[in-house]
Amino acid sequence: YTKENAIAYSDMMCARPNWHYDRYGDKEYVEHVLRYYQITNTGGSYPANGMQIPHYLQTDYGNIPYGGGSIASSGCGPTSFAMIASYLTGNTITPPDAVAWCGNSYYKPGVGTYWSYFQAAASHFGCGSVTQTSNANTVLQALSEGRPVISSQRPGLFTSGGHFIVLRGVTANGKVLVNDPNDSDAKNYINREFDMMSEIHATANAYWIFDKK
């Protein structure tokens, strides 16, 4: 989290009715805001490329049925899970594998993959427990500890509808690394670093934190 972000956040909060410096002390003070969003290092590591999670593209599986279409059109959830399952188990679990075990049991027509899919799939493939959260700092802490995360995104940077992405790590300066199952050469998100608050959390519905490998 940068000082510029902290200043913007401070200005935004202090513009709200009854939120003033004189009432809340240093709560909105820039340095305090900056410290608040600093990641607490509890022994986590910061590999340059994050966790070595394979990058699957849903567009490679247009011939595999899923939902009302195919994995290419509707399978961002299973594709995201397949990346994490392959990483955690050490086995190659492809997007078709992530769909074949349950078919459309966790798919709601016109909406997409049910959120309950992730824990059910993790149990099926032996990936351990999954924790759902909406707290950005909890996610950053989990990433710093080497725990992969899936995020549900609403319209914004990553999608014009609804979408699931994988968060594969956090850099030493607090930027987040992403495996987007709908990435492309033009977007090249695999080689980008993202600001957690303004680019990911701003359009996040929820997160699913997986066990550490």
Language-model regions, residue ranges each:
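Mid-length scaffold segments of soluble, non-membrane domains
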Residues: 93, 100-134, 144
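Loop/turn elements at helix/coil->beta-strand transitions in domains of secreted/extracellular proteins
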Residues: 125-129, 145-149, 172-175, 202-205
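Noncatalytic regulatory segments and standalone regulatory/sensor domains
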Residues: 57, 170-213
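Extracytoplasmic/secreted cell-surface and envelope-processing proteins
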Residues: 109-116, 158-163, 186-188
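Solvent-exposed, acidic/flexible segments
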Residues: 22-26, 69-78, 91, 95, ...
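Catalytic nucleophile-His microenvironment captured as a short glycine-rich beta-strand/loop
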Residues: 1, 76, 148-183
